[in-house]
From Swiss-Prot:
Signal peptide: none annotated. Transmembrane segments: none annotated. NCBIfam families: L12 (TIGR00855). Forms part of the ribosomal stalk which helps the ribosome interact with GTP-bound translation factors. Is thus essential for accurate translation. Disulfide bonds: none annotated. It comes from Streptococcus thermophilus (strain ATCC BAA-491 / LMD-9). The gene is rplL. CDD domains: Ribosomal_L7_L12. The keyword Calcium does not apply. Pfam families: Ribosomal_L12 (PF00542), Ribosomal_L12_N (PF16320). GO terms for molecular function: mRNA binding; structural constituent of ribosome. Keywords: Ribonucleoprotein, Ribosomal protein. GO terms for biological process: translation. It comes from the Bacteria. This is Large ribosomal subunit protein bL12.
Length: 122
């Protein structure tokens, strides 16, 4: 079977975000790799250690007992539809928002925890 790169790219273009997320996870597991971007080493580690983190990823670690409420909050935060929000909650642990400010991350965390979810900021 010949590998047709153009067909693969066309399929990827038509896939939803959730399908692409599942694809990335499957590739990571199959080949033992990660999709994380490499971290550049700082020239001066001491100067970097003192700098405050300015962007955070909000990760849903568990939906808890009130799954329906958590799905509603995830829909509100992400702007996704019901099906997509449910898939995000069912797929926990999963990142809800990436690269948000500390204030926004804390606000999202508070909303999710109020709905009954467990959340971590990375």
């Amino acid at each position: 079977m010949a590998l047709n790169i153009e067909n693969i790219i066309a399929e990827i273009k038509e896939a939803s975000i959730l399908e692409l997320n599942d694809l990335v996870k499957a590739i990571e597991e199959e080949f033992g790799v990660t999709a994380a971007a490499p971290v550049a080493a700082a020239a001066d580690g001491a100067a970097d250690a003192g700098a405050a983190k300015d962007s955070f990823d909000v990760e849903l670690t568990s939906a808890g007992d009130k799954k329906v409420g958590v799905i509603k909050v995830v829909r509100e935060i992400t702007g996704e539809g019901l099906k997509e929000a449910k898939a995000i909650v069912d797929g926990a642990p999963s990142v809800i928002k990436e690269g948000v400010s500390a204030a926004e991350a804390e606000e999202i965390k508070a909303k999710l925890e109020e709905a009954g979810a467990s959340v971590t900021l990375k």
